[in-house]
A protein has these predicted regions:
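Conserved catalytic scaffold of divalent metal-dependent phosphoesterases
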Residues: 93-200
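N-terminal active-site segment of His-dependent metallophosphoesterases
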Residues: 1-68, 75, 375, 379-383, ...
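Divalent metal-coordination and catalytic microenvironments
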Residues: 8, 28, 48, 63, ...
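Active-site neighborhood of phospho(di)ester-bond hydrolases with catalytic His/Asp-centered motifs
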Residues: 6-7, 43-48, 77-84, 104-109, ...
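Accessory, non-catalytic peripheral segments of nucleic-acid enzymes
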Residues: 37, 42, 259-387
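Active-site neighborhood of divalent metal-dependent phosphoester/pyrophosphate hydrolases
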Residues: 10, 40-58, 75-89, 184-200
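Conserved beta-sheet core of the metallophosphoesterase superfamily
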Residues: 184-186, 190-258, 263
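Metal-dependent catalytic neighborhoods of phosphoester/phosphodiester hydrolases
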Residues: 14-16, 49-66, 82-101, 107, ...
Length: 387
């Protein structure tokens, strides 16, 4: 049996107001091609199909079209669970219709194992699928005290109990897979992930996975990575696109699992190539260097985070020219190389209103604060000194 594991599509997500939907369409086309080329029997989507609980209509349309194509219109099984970004009720609302087309949609946590006959391999697949299990979605209060360590221990115990219940339904004559959307201790995070719980209270130990699972398919972390210290192969497939500049330089992929009953799986990573990469530029030679890079066509198809060394603030005209020359600039961040001189000014007898005016000019690209604003600032400073 060949299983493709993907996760964290985040359909509808934007990058500083820029739509990523065309890129998401392209990478879904690529995943569909991989499924067909690699003769995949089952597709698993481990949560965060959408970026918000109320996704735009175009994102929902793309999602259901993708499921239809991945299932080959009912010939291949596809299983989807809700992540922390998904609305569990909304995701599972279409489950009765989807089930008739070999698509399983699970929104709320459950300990019931899904039994699936896979005609293409003539084998049975048992999926212990656990959608994102928050306290509210579990409909349980795990700890009344505001004790993070206690909540973390209780949460891990609860997830372990759910997986243990699933383990009872796993069979030796079937392929046994667990799937969930959660944070496992030790995972490498990045900026585009919304924390599951502040402080890390919703953290699960790899020892909590069902003992008889041959593979654990995970979602939530956007960097593809194996889970350390698990008793069986467990992996985050990662997001198919880079969604923050903290992911710059990281490859994106889907995971393919070749597995038979009672046998250890063979895990392989299939790299993805679609979508615009996220790239960081550091221009230490100022604007001239940036103009040269643009003329050379450097990273022409990328989204770019630009940090540029300057002695004076960039004018609005200079900023507009950069964006006109290349629409891929997401951030343009001036780095003032005379910052040390500014710091020294603070230690001298330069009037506070002069320092404020300089700061305002740097922050606004050359703008001048009004006299009313300067007086308000001085008033606030005086009040702070009185305290």
């Amino acid at each position: 049996m060949r299983i493709l594991h993907t996760a964290d599509w985040h359909l509808g997500k934007t990058l500083e107001g820029r739509s990523r939907l065309p890129e998401q369409e392209a990478v879904i086309d690529e995943i569909v091609e991989i499924v067909q080329k690699e003769n995949i029997d089952v597709v698993l989507l481990a949560g965060d199909a959408f970026d918000t609980v109320n996704p735009p209509a175009d994102a929902e349309k793309l999602f259901y079209e993708a499921l239809s194509r991945l299932s080959d219109y009912g010939k291949r099984h596809v299983a989807v669970i809700a992540g922390n970004h998904d609305h569990p009720g909304r995701l599972s609302a279409a489950a009765p219709i989807a089930e008739k087309h070999a698509i399983t949609l699970l929104g709320f946590p459950t300990d019931r194992v899904q039994q699936i006959h896979v005609p293409s391999s003539d084998e049975t697949l048992m999926i212990g699928a656990l959608p994102y299990p928050s306290e509210s979605r579990l409909n349980e209060l795990l700890a009344e005290e505001c004790d993070e360590a206690l909540l973390r221990a209780r949460y891990d115990e609860r997830i372990r109990a759910i997986f243990a219940k699933m383990n009872e339904s796993f069979r030796e004559d079937a392929v046994n897979i667990a799937m969930s959307h959660l944070y496992v201790a030790g995972g490498a995070t990045c900026d585009s992930e919304r924390p599951i719980e502040l402080g890390g209270a919703y953290t699960v130990s790899p020892a909590s996975f069902p003992a008889s699972a041959q593979y654990v398919a995970l979602g939530h972390l956007h960097r593809p990575q194996d889970v350390k210290h698990a008793a069986m192969p467990a992996r985050y497939a990662g997001s198919p696109l880079a969604y923050s500049f903290s992911e710059a330089g990281y490859s994106k992929s889907v995971t393919i699992i070749d597995v038979q009953p009672r046998c250890a799986p063979i895990i392989s990573e299939y790299l993805l190539s679609k979508g615009r990469p996220l790239v960081k530029w550091k221009a230490t030679e100022g604007l001239a260097q940036v103009y040269r890079w643009i003329e050379e066509g450097r990273d022409r198809d990328a989204w770019i985070d630009l940090e540029i060394d300057v002695e004076q603030s960039l004018t609005l005209e200079e900023t507009h020219r950069l964006r006109k020359l290349y629409d891929g600039f997401v951030h343009i961040r001036p780095n003032y190389i005379k910052k040390e001189e500014v710091v020294r000014d603070v230690r001298t007898d330069v009037p506070i209103e002069t320092l404020f005016t300089r700061f305002y000019e740097r922050q606004t690209g050359g703008g001048k604060p009004s006299e009313q604003l300067v007086q308000l600032f001085l008033q606030l400073v005086a009040e702070e000194d009185e305290q």
